[in-house]
């Protein structure tokens, strides 16, 4: 999201002296695949706080609190062999977990040094909207605490849309 304003300014050919945390993505839009960044930091904060590192071949996901789908704390997928991410290879490829985690940690440290700020993913304990609650302690607590809806409401909504 930090790249949206710089990208829009670039598209509209508007120059400004304002410094932004992000950068224009027009170079990526106009480039060939071999010029694009091949590895990057990923975050997920919709229902659970997770972060990870992705390469063209691998995807590492680390949960920062228990997952309400009861997924493991660490997930590793080979995206070429398993594009649907069905086979977690953590136990078989601890070497790759270490390599990717080190790359991720270096990137996080670099961004903190550049901006002087920690990532909000680490600092916003009440990110899920339950004031004063903080991080979940178990998958069951996460599941019980988040309103996901109930089956009867879902059924009524589905019937209305027909």
What are these regions (language model features)?
Residues 49, 85, 96:
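Short phosphate-engaging motifs
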Residues 44, 75, 85:
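Acidic-residue sensor for enzyme active/binding pockets
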Residues 27, 44, 55, 63, ...:
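Active-site donor-binding loop signature of nucleotide-sugar glycosyltransferases
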Residues 1-53, 102, 116-120:
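Polar, surface-exposed loop/tail segments
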Residues 51-75:
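Low-complexity, glycine/alanine/valine/leucine- and proline-rich hydrophobic stretches
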Residues 89-162:
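Long, internal low-complexity/basic segments
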Residues 82:
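Intrinsically disordered, low-complexity polar regions and short flexible loop motifs
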Residues 5-9, 13, 26, 77, ...:
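Non-transmembrane alpha-helical segments in soluble domains
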